[in-house]
From Swiss-Prot:
GO terms for biological process: L-histidine biosynthetic process. Its EC number is 4.3.2.10, 3.5.1.2. The gene is hisH. Its main location: cytoplasm. CDD domains: GATase1_IGP_Synthase. GO terms for molecular function: glutaminase activity; imidazoleglycerol-phosphate synthase activity; lyase activity. Keywords: Amino-acid biosynthesis, Cytoplasm, Glutamine amidotransferase, Histidine biosynthesis, Hydrolase, Lyase. The keyword ATP-binding does not apply. It comes from Azospirillum brasilense. It holds the Pfam family GATase. This is Imidazole glycerol phosphate synthase subunit HisH. InterPro entries: Class_I_gatase-like, GATASE, Imidazole-glycPsynth_HisH. Heterodimer of HisH and HisF. It is found in: Cytoplasm. Residues 3-192 form the Glutamine amidotransferase type-1 domain.
Length: 192
């Protein structure tokens, strides 16, 4: 049985992501144990690692040393001051500023994904699949090839980024119903 470590860094509800991982594993008939942990050794030993997207960039960075969420993969972020990121994907986390001033921040709700390139984690998703977003900042990715999918909210932004064995989503897979469960199942069965 493989282990999925869901990192508990003290910043939110982990029940929803844990249940989504369990449902996706059952749906793809994969044998996974979901372990909610803050133990670095357990994270290192896990077959897969998930960092839920809860909290501000600066708060997450302070409480975490090894495994990034999508925005922590950046070189830095500007939420609550300038904070150094892990630098695994070139770019910076900046305030989401839609061109249309009537659009509210945070961007909260359903939005279409525009798949930019094929990736195993997005395999089988229908064209223009919808995902659920809640965010006020976006990852301004430097290299277009690191953007797997984008969405638009008064201008395009990176919705899924990835390189090598790293993948991150701006949206909440656990709240994105069919799209989210498919993505999580693909993540669980993805072999690098």
């Amino acid at each position: 049985m493989e282990t999925v470590a869901l990192i508990d860094y003290g910043s939110g509800n982990l029940r929803s992501p844990a249940k989504a991982l369990e449902r996706a594993a059952a749906g793809c008939h994969a044998s996974f144990q979901v372990l909610v942990t803050s133990d670095a050794d357990a994270v290192r030993k896990a077959d897969r690692v998930v960092l839920p997207a809860v909290g501000a960039f600066a708060d997450c960075k302070r409480g975490l040393s090894e495994v990034p969420g999508m925005q922590l993969m950046a070189e830095g972020g500007r939420e609550y001051g300038v904070t150094e990121g892990l630098g695994w994907i070139k770019g910076e986390v900046v305030k989401l500023e839609p061109a249309d001033p009537t659009l509210k921040i945070p961007h909260m709700g359903w939005n279409e994904l525009d798949i930019r390139r094929e990736h195993p984690v997005l395999a089988g998703l229908r064209e223009r699949a919808h995902a659920y977003f809640v965010h006020s900042y976006r990852f301004a990715v430097e290299r277009p090839e690191d953007v797997i999918a984008s969405a638009d909210y008064g201008g395009p932004f990176a919705a899924v980024v990835g390189r090598d064995n790293l993948v991150g989503t701006q949206f909440h897979p656990e709240k994105s119903q069919e799209t989210g469960l498919a993505l999580v199942a693909n993540f669980l069965t993805w072999r690098v």
